[in-house]
Regions:
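Thiamine diphosphate
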Residues: 3-166
């Protein structure tokens, strides 16, 4: 568990797993904004689509906060939201299987963790040509943490797989 010994992180483990700069005294973000951004826009879009289409399934690999799905949003989706834990391979396989079964699937996934699912991207998704959408989040050469969370290998990796439009 993360956050041991820091009261705000112990009280709000999920929010502190991935956080913007904050005031150490109270754990509050240094900058707060009510402006829309890519995360809030993605969250709002997904929630709207879930309400419009009972066949929509949203999948996460233990990173729902990257597309704005905190506990409230996940509960609002009911059984239209599935978290496969830290298992991107399972996420891609679940995405393709559900799509082949008729579900409309969206699987937002972090770029930095996508290499874990290369075989499934190629063999489950591309070769099967399953109709699904996979927004890749956190792409780019800048990361809030360290080199392990840079998200720039997604482009050469995914574009090397025939049948996937990226």
């Amino acid at each position: 568990q993360k956050g041991e010994g820091y009261a705000p992180a112990e009280a709000h483990r999920e929010e502190f797993h991935f956080s913007a700069p904050y005031d150490v005294a109270d754990g509050e973000p240094l900058q707060q904004s009510n402006e829309s951004n890519y995360i809030t826009d993605t969250r709002d879009y997904l929630l709207r689509k879930v309400n419009e289409n009972p066949e929509l399934l949203i999948i996460s690999s233990a990173t729902p906060e990257v597309f704005g799905f905190m506990e409230k949003e996940r509960k609002a989706c009911g059984n239209q939201y599935v978290d496969v834990a830290i298992a991107e391979q399972t996420g891609v396989s679940t995405m393709t299987g559900a799509a082949r079964g008729g579900a409309k699937v969206i699987y937002p996934v972090m770029a930095t963790f996508l290499q874990r699912a290369y075989d499934q991207l190629e063999q489950d998704w591309a070769m099967d040509n399953s109709p699904a959408v996979m927004p890749v989040m956190g792409t780019g050469i800048r990361a809030l943490t360290d080199l392990t969370h840079l998200g720039f290998w997604d482009i050469p990796m995914i574009t090397s797989i025939p049948e996937i439009v990226y």
